[in-house]
Amino acid sequence: MGSGYQLLQLPRERFRKTSFLVWVIILFQRAISMPLGIVTNSTLKATEIDQLVCRDKLSSTSQLKSVGLNLEGNGIATDVPSATKRWGFRSGVPPKVVSYEAGEWAENCYNLEIKKSDGSECLPLPPDGVRGFPRCRYVHKVQGTGPCPGDLAFHKNGAFFLYDRLASTVIYRGTTFAEGVVAFLILSEPKKHFWKATPAHEPVNTTDDSTSYYMTLTLSYEMSNFGGNESNTLFKVDNHTYVQLDRPHTPQFLVQLNETLRRNNRLSNSTGRLTWTLDPKIEPDVGEWAFWETKKKLFPTTSWRKLAFPNSINPHQQLLRSEPGGNCPRKN
């Protein structure tokens, strides 16, 4: 009995630290009238939100504001091969949807159109009224095939796929999305004064024009074995020229790679497919996190030295090489 009792109680020092932390949280919650709750697909219950109305800080639902928060700010890998590993197919799980009022501008969004080997579609069409995420710096458009072992594609980490003011637990076919979560912000109830002046202007709905002040660039890919253990991803330069992606990279790197291939006449010059592979010397992380500095320009000052071809190409020093078995000779 004595040893069993010892197992059920916290050590004295740990109990003191835990008690102190609990009191700090309670006092902080009392002092700050803006608690933040994160909703994932495992905690999404309307009844929980309704119960907040009966508590001290929230007197009406007008104080409850929903915000979509993107995952990319946490430093997750955003390249297509890495991102697709975070998504998986499941059967027998009903999808969940929640709306949100405001969101962030996303650096990386995705748009998938995947078919099974028999030609049938892997992903469902979006429900009526569901539109793509409206603010994307780069849209990674992926087409390809895969086993798709399940009815619907979910996020393995329990996150949402953010669309235009709508978050869903599943991926919809051909609809642009960003990865994220939904946060519910409880605002303090404003004091009402009968002499309060009317607004100087009516509020503006900034989501009407999804392209205003924001340049979107679409990057295209071909993927095989989507949803399987080992997938293969090719970056599409044009209809006959591709680059094999074998390690993490940034979208800025792909933009520069695309321009380098075109400027140096490295595109396929026939109807055959030319596939390039990256030289191991290349560092594909150029421009990492540059979007925190600015979101509205194309980073023109980034150095090209690591990607540019020399005037006289040495076969042993070139930074790109055609894949063995390619049936299309490159231009001289």
From Swiss-Prot:
Annotated signal sequence is: 1-33
Q: Give the positions annotated as glycosylation sites.
A: 41, 205, 229, 239, 258, 269
The answer to whether the entry has keyword rRNA processing is no
Listed GO CC annotations: extracellular region
The similarity annotation says: Belongs to the filoviruses glycoprotein family.
**Principal place where this protein is found?**
secreted
Q: Where in the cell is it found?
A: Secreted
Intrachain disulfide bonds? 109-136, 122-148
Checking Pfam families in the record gives: Filo_glycop
Instruction: Please name the InterPro entries in this protein's record.
Output: GPC_FiloV, GPC_filovir-type_extra_dom
The gene behind this protein is: GP
Enumerate the UniProt keywords alphabetically.
Answer: Disulfide bond, Glycoprotein, Secreted, Signal
Protein name per UniProt: Super small secreted glycoprotein
